[in-house]
């Protein structure tokens, strides 16, 4: 069979780091300095090189795409967006998958590779870690996996505070980018572009506002509105 087993130490990722909090902070950090990243080619190259080296080291030590699952800030961002996808790969009959002993969809077969995303397609119930490559459909000997359409935004269940915070961080960053990059105000733009202007005090203020809005103000506002909605809905 075409197994995707890789070399390395194959250690388990630490459970206490298995939530999205690390990715959330890395994503927020990268976006806070994004104006610098896109205007300084040397810094852009250094960040990309650091990510590649980190991915190689983590892959050599840990198993199951640990870098993508638990460290890569962009993967967390993509996983939230995938919940709004209009298509999904799912079993036709979950009972047949439960009776299957080979699980070729995950481990591979003579006809196709195992899941390159290293999930078990027979147990998929959300899109967050599925890349829709459809390799599992070719691998399944029982033809029990399919791709199907679904209503937009039908998979919006948040399974933890870390996922909820990531969604709120994304909203806060949209507001921040609108003000600093698209708005008519020159002062906030100069704060974010510290390497051109040299206003480090303004940049620190910019970062403080963005982080406070993303981690405190917006979650507090969302929580307050949720409580009001619950109160008035009975």
Predicted features, each with a name:
Residues 1-98, 119, 137, 143-144, ...:
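Membrane-embedded alpha-helical bundles of multi-pass integral membrane proteins
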């Amino acid at each position: 069979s075409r197994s995707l087993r890789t070399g390395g130490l194959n250690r388990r990722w630490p459970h206490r780091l298995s939530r999205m909090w690390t990715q959330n902070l890395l994503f927020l950090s990268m976006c806070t300095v994004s104006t610098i990243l896109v205007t300084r080619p040397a810094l852009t190259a250094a960040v990309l090189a650091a990510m590649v080296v980190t991915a190689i080291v983590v892959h050599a030590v840990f198993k199951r795409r640990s870098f993508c699952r638990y460290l890569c800030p962009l993967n967390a961002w993509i996983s939230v967006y995938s919940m709004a996808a209009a298509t999904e790969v799912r079993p036709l009959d979950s009972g047949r998958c439960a009776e299957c002993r080979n699980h070729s969809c995950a481990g591979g077969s003579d006809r196709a590779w195992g899941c390159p995303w290293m999930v078990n397609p027979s147990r998929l119930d959300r899109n967050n870690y599925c890349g829709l490559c459809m390799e599992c459909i070719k691998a399944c000997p029982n033809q029990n996996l399919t791709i199907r359409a679904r209503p937009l935004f039908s998979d919006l269940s948040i399974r933890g505070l870390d996922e909820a915070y990531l969604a709120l961080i994304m909203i806060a960053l949209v507001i921040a980018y609108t003000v600093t990059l698209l708005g008519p105000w020159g002062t906030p733009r100069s704060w974010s572009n510290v390497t051109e202007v040299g206003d480090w005090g303004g940049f620190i203020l910019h970062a403080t506002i963005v982080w406070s809005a993303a981690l405190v103000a917006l979650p507090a506002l969302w929580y307050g509105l949720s409580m009001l909605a619950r109160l008035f809905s009975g």
